[in-house]
């Protein structure tokens, strides 16, 4: 009987001191998944996620048929709710190795590997509601609309493993693997 009491006290002691507490949750020692959303049931690779405003997020990824997509989501401040808002297929051929960055105001730039793994940069506006409007994208090269402008093909050999950062309000820098997987850093004015 005495052994059961000791074991019960030890179990209670371990539960009290080992259960996660909000007081310690922000020190990085505990990671708990709050919720999740399967936003693409066919394919969702080469993800790059950025915050648009307090509860709006934009995701560039390779989706179905290896095409390039951007989707926006509203995520509650406590992470308990994720709702998809808008999706745009910006490249109907290829969209790997995405790196999405905020440039200025509601303008965003995306570096990715497109057709033949060439390096491309596209631009979009994303408003605070999550509505995506293309400015310069690869699919514009396939239209007859006068206002549609194709995106920039910055490397005609290879543009993989992109990492894009904002330098100032109209300049971005891109690190990527180019010809023969050599490392390159390039800057661009948007």
Q: Would you name each region that the model predicts?
A:
Residues 26-190:
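Extracellular, repeat-based ectodomains that mediate carbohydrate processing or recognition
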Residues 1-25:
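Sec-dependent, cleavable N-terminal signal peptides
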């Amino acid at each position: 009987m005495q052994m059961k009491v000791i074991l019960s006290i030890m179990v209670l002691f371990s539960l009290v001191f080992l259960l996660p507490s909000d007081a310690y949750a922000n020190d990085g020692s505990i990671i708990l998944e709050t919720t999740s959303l399967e936003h693409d049931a066919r394919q969702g690779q080469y993800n790059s996620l950025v915050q648009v405003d307090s509860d709006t997020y934009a995701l560039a990824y390779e989706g179905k048929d290896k095409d390039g997509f951007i989707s926006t989501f509203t995520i509650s401040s406590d992470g308990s709710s994720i709702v998809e808002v808008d999706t745009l297929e910006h490249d109907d051929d290829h969209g790997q190795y995405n790196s999405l960055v905020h440039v200025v105001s509601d303008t965003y730039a995306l570096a990715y590997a497109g057709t033949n793994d060439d390096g491309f940069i596209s631009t979009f506006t994303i408003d605070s509601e999550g509505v995506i409007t293309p400015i310069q994208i690869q699919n514009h090269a396939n239209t007859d609309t006068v206002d549609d402008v194709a995106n920039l093909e910055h490397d005609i050999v290879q543009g993989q493993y992109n990492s894009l950062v904002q330098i100032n309000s109209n300049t971005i820098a891109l690190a990527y693997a180019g010809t023969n997987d050599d490392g390159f850093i390039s800057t661009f004015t948007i």
